[in-house]
Swiss-Prot record:
Biased composition, class Basic and acidic residues, residue ranges: 40-62
Domain PCI per the UniProt entry, residue ranges: 213-389
Pfam families tied to this protein: SAC3_GANP
Family classification: Belongs to the SAC3 family.
Name of the protein in its database record: SAC3 family protein C
Length: 406
């Protein structure tokens, strides 16, 4: 792997102190790394309390944020000290094993793990990667996303942990410039794509992985929004900002999910006028209205014709919900003596006709052929049921256009 742009990041990579000190976790409540770590504050403040008056006078004008600032000097994706330790403990992921050896790795494939118990006393500049190395690390991780050698859940689990470590290193160094915005956007993409792909995986741990992925998606989005705001310029929207802001709205399609904490009514008040009027925000607001009205036809039609790939990935579960609602509506309210044509239903649900027939069967409904040879759905059937297990994912007509937007 080529090593480019190595070395410490410049001072321009850091926002002003108004952005706030952040703890060394990936909690994003007040920034890309979260609020102030109280234990870290105590460690930083204690020496000052013990200093004599002369020392206090000497340091009285220093900003605590500057005292704790760390500039990473690690030039590889994983600090040598960590790599050697994990080799000894045989703690290497499958992607980090040199020729499959569980106790041997290299600087080209070992990636720093996320540490849940990191404190200020543990941090050394040689263990922290500067921005150019973090950029290279993320490129390497995302290159594994389409790996066919291992199941997706294995790939996801590795990238999931290592991107948290990237966010942790960004937080330690208080990095939040435009290059960092790009890193966060790419990490959000990873979580969104994982959200969609994990739906098709099976296994006892998938439910937990899906929950944790959504949790980190929410945190990463919150961090990204904070960095957008910290770098805000008058009357300026970042190139992808409106699309990434729109994902917050889509995560509120189901208000009981509790994925994102702040109510939409409060969240919208914080957006700039330009963002509120952007086509991406207008689109998802309309989609939200259609979803809550149960207007499945327009919801699916607008999604197929206007959604980006990231918006589609977030909406996919709700697309399945709306299709179930539609089949139930048709079965309950249509005239019994006039079976409903599956061709018309497929057009409304943006599905292939054969897929609609399969969906009806999953819902416990029978289909038949009318005298003209068309497949129809007899209505008023008492056997309708919502599939108990995860039912099959059916393509949305228009998915080709959507996938081209990624």
């Amino acid at each position: 792997m080529n090593r480019r742009n190595r070395g410490s990041s410049s001072s321009s990579s850091r926002v002003s102190n108004t952005y706030g000190n952040r703890q060394f976790s990936d909690n994003p409540r007040t920034g890309s790394g979260g609020g102030v770590n109280e234990s870290f504050q105590r460690r930083s403040d204690a020496p000052h309390k013990r200093n004599n008056e002369k020392d206090e006078s000497k340091h009285k004008d220093e900003d605590p944020a500057d005292v704790s600032l760390i500039v990473g000097t690690c030039s590889s994706m994983c600090p040598e000290r960590e790599r050697v330790t994990r080799e000894r403990l045989r703690d290497l992921a499958v992607f980090e094993r040199l020729y499959g050896n569980p106790s041997k790795s290299s600087t080209e494939i070992a990636v720093k793990k996320f540490c849940r118990t990191l404190s200020a006393a543990d941090v050394q500049a040689s263990d922290v990667r500067p921005l150019p190395v973090l950029e290279e690390t993320l490129r390497y991780l995302l290159s594994l996303l389409d790996s066919k050698e291992h199941p997706f859940e294995v790939v996801h689990d590795f990238i999931f942990d290592r991107t948290r470590s990237i966010r942790q290193d960004l937080s330690i160094q208080n990095l939040a410039n435009e290059r960092v915005i790009y890193l966060y956007e790419e990490m959000v993409k990873f979580h969104v794509i994982s959200h969609e792909r994990l739906q098709s995986c099976s296994g006892t741990s998938i439910s937990s992985m899906h929950h944790l992925n959504m949790e980190q998606l929410a945190k990463t989005l919150t961090s990204l929004y904070n960095i957008y705001d910290a770098n805000r310029k008058p009357d300026y929207i970042y190139e992808n900002e409106a699309e990434f802001r729109s994902l917050y709205v889509l995560l509120h399609l189901n208000p009981s999910s509790g994925v994102m904490g702040e109510p939409l009514s409060l969240w919208f008040r914080k957006l700039t006028f330009a963002l509120v009027k952007s086509k991406e925000i207008c689109f998802v607001r309309n989609l939200l209205r259609l979803y809550r009205m149960g207007n499945y036809k327009n919801f699916l039609s607008r999604t197929a014709s206007e959604a980006t790939y990231l918006q589609y990935c977030i909406s996919e579960h709700h697309i399945r919900e709306m299709r179930l609602v539609a089949v139930q509506y048709i079965n309950n309210v249509c005239y019994k003596l006039q079976p409903y044509p599956l061709l018309r239903l497929s057009q409304n649900l943006k599905m292939k006709e054969l897929d609609v027939e399969s969906l009806c069967h999953e819902c416990g409904l029978e289909t038949c052929t009318d005298p003209d040879g068309f497949t129809v759905l007899p209505v008023k059937q008492s056997t309708f049921r919502s599939p108990e297990d995860k039912f099959k994912v059916y393509d949305l007509i228009g998915i080709e256009r959507i996938k081209m937007s990624i």
